[in-house]
């Protein structure tokens, strides 16, 4: 039984990585088409709210508990939802204006490093003397060598791009992606203590709802600056929201829930997300005609993927 569950979880994890990778490719497609990056960043989440609401209705998950949980810690929900979603996605689409999608996907793996380093900011439930307590998480020291490997892999891919984009573009993109890589795990980790009673889909819906006013204001700014988005931008951002924001999220949560009883198997399923980079490269080659600038980038990708897999397996 466990073997069949693991096989199912493995396939779901791989599919989730594929749907997650679509984000990086479509962002590059929109950039090439001249779509304004602020529209690209806001429309995904404007689409996601009704899509997630529809999903909750299909799955018959109640909505009232979501509002009760948000109301009980409104300030925290607004703050960390905006950091985790707005602070994550806007810098990512901004960087996609200057760098190819596969490279954005590669640099984005820095979020694994910052996810581990921000562990002490999270409190996890533990039983102490027969009573439940929230205990501050610790940085798993066994992961540190593999975090260095990931950083080296990212560095090689970035160095390989030097000379193909202007230095200031590379620098500002790297800074933006670094900020996004910190904001995403930090926002999500700080929300977790307030979302203990919610399912994964309910939590994503709640965070999207709390960040929605910000995305609406940003879309108004985009409208005033460049006018309404094109039909192509609307369609592409819809597919990004559907693919990455809904389908991939649901698949990944389902995959992890199947093996949640075994931390070793859970780590192996989480390691499938290293395939985001692989799928981004393959899709870039097939649909965008992307090529590597030099062998440093190939080496960097190999090191990066190896590091991502090992940091999960060694937890």
Language-model regions, residue ranges each:
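Loop-to-transmembrane alpha-helix entry segments
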Residues: 105-108, 124-156, 170-171, 261, ...
